[in-house]
Amino acid sequence: MNRRQWLYGAGFLAGAGQFGSSSAAPPAQKNVSQPKPMDLTQYEPKSVLQVHESQMEQSKFPLIDFHTHISFSAKSEHGVELAPERQYLGTPEELLAVMERKNIRAMVNVTGGYDKGLAEAVGKYDRAHPGRFYTFTEPSYSRFKEADYPKVQAQAIDQAHHDGARGLKILKTLGLYLRESITSGTLVKIDDSRFDPMWDACGQLNLPVAIHVSDPIAFFTPTDRFNERYEELNNHPDWSFHGGDFPSNDELIAARNRVMARHPKTQFVALHVGNFAENLQNVSENLDRFPNMFVDIAARIGELGRQPTTSRKFFEKYQDRILFGTDATPHGDEFPQQVFNDKLYEIYFRFLETEDEYFDYAPAKIPPQGRWRIYGINLSDTILRKVYYGNSARLLQI
């Protein structure tokens, strides 16, 4: 019995109780079409909620996007970069056009590579357009098996600094992909002592370390009907780290924390809100514990925006240690939450600057990370200036 049938039955029985027995039949029902099952990928509900929609053509203040991917390795295997050569996702002219429209003072290309690839990227962007682009270097994992790798990698950081690198980027390769034989064998832990000289070199040269460890907590749980990011993982099954020999999210975060504790003179930017935007209490505890820790918000406004009250308090308390970043990738249409275009930046501005309610966190028909919407946190001008520009400028020494 469906709800409509139950209501008809309840009314009929009530009448029978009041007036005695009756032979009257229940009112005839109109033919009601039953919804047909559909594939979840076809489901694109449109909200009927009538709320204010702010139009955000530019950020209120100039900004530095601390987290973008303008280039990537030309050769990789099993998640590990194996060659210094780079492939580029956008020309300086293409990027600058968007930057001018959106009030972006500078972009940081965190995946600038190493050796000749780094030198080429710095020349192509940083030196050709001073003050608009800043490039980070990356570890040369292809030499990891060499006996003197710790020394070689520390020297590579010094050379990268000489070549113009403004920081070091650690992809989740370390902890989730790099193995003792580079692409095979036991996983190498984030706090492996062989990397200590590299962390120290960054501290001595005042190069910030942009470190990505772990991933959304849903990626470490079964991809089943209870997983709120089921569609995302179904589309990208290789993003799941549940099972196998992968460490847990807690183990990865703990290993990163041990690195920060061992190297207090090195500044670490724990990307993606410390890779734990689902638990701002945990991120807050780590920020309180490690004065050399910062965070960016790249690709996590979907998490921050569904807890607006908690997020606003988080920004207010840690306003000097939060960096604006998007994880933007030119021509990366497969991942709408990080595609480099005007619309992406407008959503970030709306989240940070307004009190708008229930809006999309990515320019996509179907929310790419989970089926929810977000709310703006309306930060003060003082905090916006720091998050948009001041905090990144201080770390980059510009």
What positions do the PLM features span?
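N-terminal export signals
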Residues: 5-25
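An N-terminally biased module of ancient metal coordination in phosphate/nucleic-acid-related enzymes
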Residues: 6-7, 26-128, 391
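H/E-rich (His + Asp/Glu) clusters that bind or coordinate divalent metals
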Residues: 34-47, 89, 244, 249-258, ...
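Active-site gating/metal-coordination segments in enzymes
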Residues: 35-47, 118-239
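Acidic (Asp/Glu)-rich catalytic clusters
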Residues: 56-57, 96-101, 120-132, 156-164, ...
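Hydrophobic faces of well-ordered beta-strands that scaffold small-molecule active sites
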Residues: 64-68, 107-109, 135-137, 168, ...
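Conserved, mostly hydrophobic/aromatic
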Residues: 67, 99, 202, 295, ...
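Acidic-and-aromatic substrate-binding clefts and catalytic sites of carbohydrate-active enzymes
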Residues: 72-75, 84-90, 110-119, 142-151, ...
